[in-house]
Every structure is written in structure tokens, then in C-alpha cells.
């Protein structure tokens, strides 16, 4: 996953307005892409515990953003979960 190629595509897909780069939806989508990429890395490198810690931190940050979104805008929260194929 090259972040210079993938990041603008994700931002374009989930942005809420033209100059949006930091809304909760965009942040969750970017974190999900990084989490998915790191999960694949950890499947082949099982003993990479430093990366595993980073994965857990990213998952926790994503969970906090999703909780915020759920509290403040429930329709966007459910739509985002469906788009990203996330549970809960």
C-alpha cells in the first residue's frame, strides 16, 4: 500500500465537502485502510510485535472516532460501517 497513491483516493471517496481531509469519516476510512494493510503484514510476520502494538493503537483510535460519530451523527455512522464492512 503506497500511501501517496491510496490516501487521496480514500479521501476523495469519503469526503463530506471539497476541502475535507480530516472529518471523522475520512479519518476512519484512512485508519481502516492502514489496519487492513498491517493485518496482511502481520499474517506473514507473526513475531513482529512492534507492528502489532501499532495495529492495536490504530484500532483503538478508530474505535474512539466511531464512538464519537455514533454519538453525534447516527445515520453517517451506520452508512460508514456498511461502506467499510465493519461490525458493530
Swiss-Prot record:
Pfam families: Ribosomal_S15 (PF00312). GO terms for biological process: translation. Keywords: Ribonucleoprotein, Ribosomal protein, RNA-binding, rRNA-binding. GO terms for molecular function: rRNA binding; structural constituent of ribosome. InterPro entries: Ribosomal_uS15, Ribosomal_uS15_bac-type, uS15_NS1_RNA-bd_sf. It comes from the Bacteria. GO terms for cellular component: cytosolic small ribosomal subunit. Signal peptide: none annotated. The keyword rRNA-binding applies. Part of the 30S ribosomal subunit. Forms a bridge to the 50S subunit in the 70S ribosome, contacting the 23S rRNA. PANTHER family: RIBOSOMAL PROTEIN S15, BACTERIAL AND ORGANELLAR, SMALL RIBOSOMAL SUBUNIT PROTEIN US15M. One of the primary rRNA binding proteins, it binds directly to 16S rRNA where it helps nucleate assembly of the platform of the 30S subunit by binding and bridging several RNA helices of the 16S rRNA. Belongs to the universal ribosomal protein uS15 family. This is Small ribosomal subunit protein uS15. It comes from Opitutus terrae (strain DSM 11246 / JCM 15787 / PB90-1).
